Amino acid sequence: MQQRRRPPIASRETLQALLSEGAQALGVALSDAQRGALLDYVALLAKWNAVYNLTAIRDPRQMLIQHILDSLSIVPHLGAHGAAAAALDVGSGGGLPGVVLAIALPGWRVTLNDIVHKKSAFQNQAKAELKLGNLSVVTGRVETLRPGADVPAKFDVIVSRAFADLADFVTLARHLVAPGGSIWAMKGVRPDEEIGRLPDGARVKQMIRLTVPSLDAERHLIEVELDEAI
């Protein structure tokens, strides 16, 4: 029986072209150094995926599209918080979208959070190898994190990509939102049922339909504002 051939692994030059075109389509300006760091991050994900169980995606080209470009798609919208905001990425896993935010927004201070120590170990490795001085890692349940103790302070932006139901996310993380800050959830299809379960004092400020280059799938970004943070 003839074995099915695996598709060839994309070269770094091919990935760089895909990244450059994708970032331009998203309106995200990246320097050569930032593009290099994002490609190095893809290489780290591909290298250590089997050890750390980071993603079901094995192909670097698909990693670039489904992880890097997907994460870059939120940068223009989060940028409204200014050039020096503090962000918390909840349920970060392999560092998404937090590592991408730390690279694309070098003036931001980004904290990655996960409950799995193995994932945190990879996050720390990525921080060291990519030399991201604006990135920090904290392990533990988000609802137990205390500003001024487990994390330096409250956050302008709290974001998640694949963490939990929207209502649960808001309930667990709302104590960490700084005045004027908000919670952002990256979702696939429009999450109307999840929005209907939002807790008291929380409401959708905006729902943005995202278009991710080379990705044929629905993507939405939901911003939730809180009474206590207004």
From Swiss-Prot:
It holds the Pfam family GidB. Keywords: Cytoplasm, Methyltransferase, rRNA processing, S-adenosyl-L-methionine, Transferase. S-adenosyl-L-methionine binds at G91, L96, V142, E143, R161. InterPro entries: rRNA_ssu_MeTfrase_G, SAM-dependent_MTases_sf. It is found in: Cytoplasm. Its main location: cytoplasm. Its EC number is 2.1.1.170. HAMAP family: 16SrRNA_methyltr_G (MF_00074). Belongs to the methyltransferase superfamily. RNA methyltransferase RsmG family. Specifically methylates the N7 position of guanine in position 527 of 16S rRNA. This is Ribosomal RNA small subunit methyltransferase G. The lineage of its organism: Bacteria, Pseudomonadati, Pseudomonadota, Betaproteobacteria, Burkholderiales. The gene is rsmG.
